[in-house]
Amino acid sequence: MRIPSFLFVTVFIFLMSCHQKKINHDLFLPDDLEATLWAQSPLFYNPTNMDVDIKGRIWITEAVNYRNFNNDSIHFLHHQNGDRIMILQDTDGDGEADVSKVFVEDKDLVSPLGIAVIGNKIFVSCSPHLLVYTDADGDDKPDSKEIFLTGFGGRDHDHSLHSMVAGPDGNLYFNTGNAGPHLVTDKAGWTLRSGSVYTGGTPYNLTNQGNMKSDDGRVWVGGLALRINPDGTGLKVMGHNFRNSYEVMVDSYGNLWQNDNDDQVVACRTSWLMEGGNAGFFSNDGTRFWQADQRPGQDIFEAHWHQDNPGVMPAGDQTGAGSPTGMAVNESDALGEDYLGMVLSAEAGRNVIFSYKPKPKDSGYDIGKRTNLISSLPQDNERYVWNDSAQNASNNKWFRPSDVTIGTDGAIYIADWHDPVVGGHQMQDSIGYGRIYRITPKNKNLKAPHLDLTSTAGQIEALENPAINVRYQGYEKLKAQGDRVADDVMSLLKSSNPYHQARAVWLLSQLGEKGKTETEKLLQHTDTIIRSVAFRALRQVEKDIIPIAEKLSDDPSSFVRREVATALRDLPYEKTKPILLKLIKQYDGQDRWYLEAIGAACDGHAEELYPEIKTLFGGDTQKPEEWNTQLASILWRLHPAAAISGLKARAVSSKLSTKEKTASATALAFTSTKESVHAMIDLTKCNDSIIAEQASYWLAFRQSNDWFNLADWSKVGNAINLEHTRMLSTMKVKRGIILDKRQSFNEKKWNVQAMAKNAIGGQMLLSMREENSLPSELYPVVENVIFNNPDLGVRVQASNYFKKPGSGKTFSITEIAKIKGKATSGDTLFSKNCSSCHRVKNKGMDIGPDLTGIKNKFEQEALLDAIIHPNAGIVFGYEAWLITTKRGDSFFGFLVADGAQAIVIKDLDGARHTIATSTIVSRKKQSNSLMPEPSSLGLTDQNLADIVTYLTMMK
């Protein structure tokens, strides 16, 4: 029987009164700050996100009904009428909440992940909907409910629709994770189509796909940062290809800041997000996971975020393993000068609030040194493992900050999910306990101001407020007054707080012709950031921004010029080409942000621009090996087909460094013509062994995706042995992970298991053991797997280096092969022991591979080997697929790429098979299963001979 909520609260209060002293409220934080427990359950439960209203109250989204498909609601607190939105308030000003009320309890709310309180409209993010509740009469109850947007993927999933905030431009910003597809149409009819190869995580996330075009003609993939007008029109992608950025935060300059979590490796990050930036989690079209694209020699962080690929933005600060959540930018003076401008990033896995002090660098931002601003632990662990119960046993590790925000009083508020684990759609805290901490300066009493929106002075005060969605209300009220408040707003340009100045710039551009004229004057301001904000603001109000872009194309700051390049991406190329060439000419050859901005502006026009770009840098009169850094870098980014011969020449030049030659080979790999393939084949024959090996890798890799239709791969493969090259590259990557001291034990374990199951990987492990380079703690892991390696030579050699675990009866393939089998007995034995997983013609199930045509794939001894050593190729932890072709072949394995022309299956031995989609009859996703060893089924030598005879003699 499910426990009623009211009874649960009674039990909760009793338990809390008995065990209050056992809950650790202590936090480690700077000496000049102090933390107080502002609120805790039962005022609310399981907080996922929060916001602040104009009264200084905290609004909370609860996720009590959290993943009921994974967490039995009978044993956890459950709200039968749906999850709730709660309002918390400190009515007596003593620094602790004393009142809570339910704003809404709604069955449409299933673990909502975001809330924005914007006046009397409360936006709630809960895939597939972005909902808006309107409290028209101010009684803290919704009078209406509207689906503001719908079509987001990720129902009841962490990688889904996240929170919304109001930007300084008057628009709304929000983001979503990679649990697509996201098929969203705004109120003007513009449609976003975004997806990727990622499925799973919940029972609802079953279908997804990459390489979809939105109405702007662009391919957006994975997680997204989005902007929309308050009326629901003007949906625009601000960044894409995230894994699962939990919250994208916009500051008063219009900068976007985001954190993103990893694929259970040490690759979480925090970064500045340039408009339109590609964060690099999937391949550019979303049809491949990062693991499929990892190259030999790349570390996990580089590969995880595709850092060596043209078209991908810099990844920012590598924070290690973890579960990053909410973000905030402190624009308040209340905490003191040291904290002004601090970017705060909540890290639920690591029990910490990270902080940064970003500064402009070149044309972008250096996010600065990461510090552990607030934590429940004295020391941080970058190799944290989310489901390590032993490590999470101590309740000081149950501090799980799900969100961080700045209140109207200037204090930092931290929502604490509070649970032994975070991740994997799990929770272990059955009572739904949650907390909110308030961080303030010592010896300073911060008070929430009374904001009067009926007067200009009150509206200015609201605009200055540190609570992001509160200042939006001041913005809107002042904007409605038009140019008559221009002078009042201009007074903020003299503020000692730079964020107040920036807010004034944005608002001025909206205050009629007078305000716009004053904003244009700011394009000549001595401060680079003010000039850039003025340009950003004018982009949104000027019908024709090209004349202003032309003026700023000679700005002394690369930061401003990069803003201009960013704007050109959305403008008619025929009108902006001269500006674009001027911007390209000023590229310094080093600045990656600038390079990516001009690369995006050149999108679709690289071939046309190639001759003129060469001329700009003198490349038209030089040999390719003489190209300067600027030209070489730009051609790496643009990789036009016209540059193939030059790129090939640079890749083999003895006058260039390995780094320069590698860059040219990489650029060549991102062109897609038959000439590209031929050039890469030629590189496999060059005298530089490093480049030759890279070229072999690129051919093996590109065969399955961009170059699939550009060559007769059977001929190329026979000449170069592409399959071996591909597998060798994969095993090299895994070996690098095992030898990387930064990786967690679990990460090494998964990779060493994969190597031990693979013929090439097994040989590598034996060599590593011989060299004493294999970590000793991995010996038991290898021993449990390697004796089932598909390569007989590996299995035989393994006994010289590893201890073979005890097993049942030992079968001899050679001896069984000599036994005369009976097909009729084999038929009976198959029905009894095998048909529950395997199908032969119309007999059996489709859980394992279809064995109808198995005799065409295996000789007798090979088939015996597969039956006797059933675990030889099963990769643990992934969902398998069964692919059937028109020829009758069956491929059982794991889908790593899903393109329009071909798919790639990694089979149970780790081999990758490229299959043309036109030859596929069916593709079925399989449940994880393990085929039992013959001895566990009580099978004898004669039984095995009978089964093999039946399978090989079947017509």
Model-derived features: positions:
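C-terminal capping alpha-helices of c-type cytochrome domains
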Residues: W38, N120-K121, I412, A504, ...
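Inter-heme linker and motif-flanking segments adjacent to c-type heme-binding CXXCH motifs
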Residues: R155, V421-V422, I529-V533, Q540-V541, ...
